[in-house]
Design a protein with these regions (language model features):
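Domain-level recognition of nuclease-like catalytic cores that cleave nucleotide substrates
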Residues: 378-403
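Short glycine-rich substrate-engagement loop in P-loop NTPases that contacts/grips substrate
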Residues: 53-83
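Pre-Walker A adenine-sensing motif
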Residues: 4-17
Length: 403
């Protein structure tokens, strides 16, 4: 099988090498972190000045490496001080006290450290305090639409986009194939693995049925503004008496696994971030679809919004939900140096009411930052409507944000 290189991630790794920096590759399980690490390993192996120390905690052969002492012993036995030693550890959070090892090695002149992890809290507490800002995170996402086409050898077409909307972007589907039942079984397996290893075990979850109900609720309500109180009310209607505090904690645990992302609301006029009532999106829309029983036509707006959110993050934006006095802006996106854009996500602009909701809300923002509507409206590829750029979803996913 032809190896497919996700070059942008390898370029990011190369950018941080040789700078006394720990490189941490993060993201949900099965989105390609391990694959990226192995591609880097294979590339470095071509250099005779490199000594590679590779540990994959998901492989049985590394099962004896349980603690930082085990890790130190393994590294010391294989270290060659006459070369550059690349310490590569996959799923490093599965080693108890790993932060002690990282702290001990990262300033050594002959060592580069690159690790992967599936929990956003792996750098919390002790390690973050010890190393300060001496680390760089590289966030690996599920496949983009363009990567999906490359992985599955498909052309850029409406049919391929429909497949991407339905199946999502887990790289493992290349081997599984795009049969609906096989794909759903694989997505369900990935979901179960994330839930067990990165949520339940890591946080000692006892109320597993509620956790699963919460994940399904967030899948069914992706892209909707949600509060802990509204979830508690729904759960009570299902016979579960859960406190708002428990809901907040369980939602946080799900987000720490990178499977789900919480997006804050931003008051566009008041220029402040609200502390409640957020939106949630899934890292992979295929997993989201599998949790609600498959790709449903009535969910198309939610899935499109989910896809647009993930691609905006891929383009390097920090994304929030915009709040106006008389409406909502799906995404307020910012970058460094004050760059900002506003984006509305829609399925099809088919009538005046939909047009006014999407375009009218953008016109209510009285500033000169770029404004976009992204939809699947037929015959639209790119158009301008009084300064608002209307892009077809396919064009956005292949060309980015054009003016």
């Amino acid at each position: 099988m032809k190896a497919i290189v996700r070059q942008s991630y390898l370029d990011k790794i190369a950018k941080y090498l040789g700078k006394d920096t720990i490189i941490i590759i993060v993201g949900q399980r099965r989105v390609g972190k391990s694959y990226t690490l192995r591609l880097f390993r294979d590339k470095v192996a071509e250099d005779i000045r490199a000594n590679i120390i590779f540990i994959d905690k998901e492989k049985h052969e590394f099962g004896d490496i349980q603690t930082d002492r085990d890790l130190n012993a393994y590294i010391d036995e294989r270290r060659d001080k006459t070369k550059t030693n690349y310490i590569l550890v996959d799923e490093v959070q599965d080693i108890e006290g790993f932060e002690n090892s990282i702290r001990g090695y990262y300033e050594e002149p002959d060592i580069e450290i690159i690790v992967t992890g599936s929990s956003s809290n792996m750098l919390s507490g002790d390690l973050a305090n010890k190393i300060g800002g001496r680390y760089k995170e590289i966030f690996v996402q599920a496949l983009s639409y363009e990567e999906f086409m490359e992985f599955h050898e498909l052309p850029d077409s409406d049919d391929t986009l429909a497949k991407y909307i339905q199946f999502g972007g887990l790289p493992g589907l290349k081997k599984i194939g795009l049969d609906e039942q096989d794909a759903r079984e694989y997505q369900t397996d990935v979901y179960s693995t994330v839930l067990l290893k990165d949520v339940i075990k890591r946080n000692n979850i006892r109320n597993v049925p509620f956790l699963e109900n919460l994940a399904h609720f967030l899948a069914d309500n992706a892209g909707k503004i949600i509060s802990a109180n509204s979830i508690a009310k729904y759960m009570r209607s299902q016979g579960e008496n859960i406190t708002s505090t428990a809901i907040i904690n369980y939602a946080k645990y799900l987000c720490e696994s990178y499977m789900i992302h919480k997006v804050n609301r931003y008051d566009i006029h008041g220029r402040k971030i609200f502390e409640s009532n957020d939106k949630f999106y899934f890292e992979d829309n295929g997993i989201r679809n599998s949790l609600v029983g498959g790709s449903r036509e009535r969910d198309i707006e939610k899935v499109i919004e989910n896809i647009i959110y993930n691609h905006l993050v891929r383009l390097g934006y920090e994304v929030m939900v915009g709040q106006l006095q008389a409406g909502e802006i799906d995404f307020v996106c910012t970058k460094a140096k004050g760059e900002r854009i506003y984006v509305q996500a829609s399925y099809i602009i088919a009538d005046d009411n939909t047009y006014e909701r999407e375009f009218g809300n953008l016109r209510a923002i009285k500033d000169n930052y770029p404004k976009y509507v992204i939809s699947m409206t037929p015959l639209v590829t790119k158009s301008d409507d009084n300064g608002i750029t209307h892009l077809h979803l396919r064009r956005f996913l292949t060309n980015g944000l054009e003016r």
